[in-house]
Amino acid sequence: MTQSSYNPIEQEGSPELLLQEKIRRPKMYQVLLHNDNYTTMEFVVSILMKIFRKTMEQATSIMLSVHRKGIGVAGVYTRELAETKVNTTHMLAREAGFPLRCTLQEVDE
């Protein structure tokens, strides 16, 4: 029997390259809060604390950024988690009678 010269690692590339090809970081998305003239600052802070797990200080800082700039980043997450947070925010805002708007934006790599 002769020894085969076929080596799948050599044919396909180095182990490091194979690992890099198999394990890719998921795309990340910013969850953006948009300012409006009706949603209270207190409600925005409560959403940031409950849904986005921010401290009171972090939530207040983000809320003030949204208020002053018209938009602010609530957090950066994988797509599925970001979509869940957006949907939960919209549901709670509707239940409370607020038009708070929340959107996703893909993070550039």
UniProtKB/Swiss-Prot annotation:
Top-level taxon: Bacteria
One Pfam family linked to the record: ClpS
InterPro entries recorded: ClpS (IPR022935), ClpS_core (IPR003769), Ribosomal_bL12_C/ClpS-like (IPR014719)
GO terms for biological process, alphabetical: protein catabolic process; proteolysis
UniProt cross-references to HAMAP family, sorted A to Z: ClpS (MF_00302)
Purpose: Involved in the modulation of the specificity of the ClpAP-mediated ATP-dependent protein degradation.
Family: Belongs to the ClpS family.
Subunit structure: Binds to the N-terminal domain of the chaperone ClpA.
Protein name per the record: ATP-dependent Clp protease adapter protein ClpS
Taxonomic path: Bacteria, Pseudomonadati, Thermodesulfobacteriota, Desulfovibrionia, Desulfovibrionales
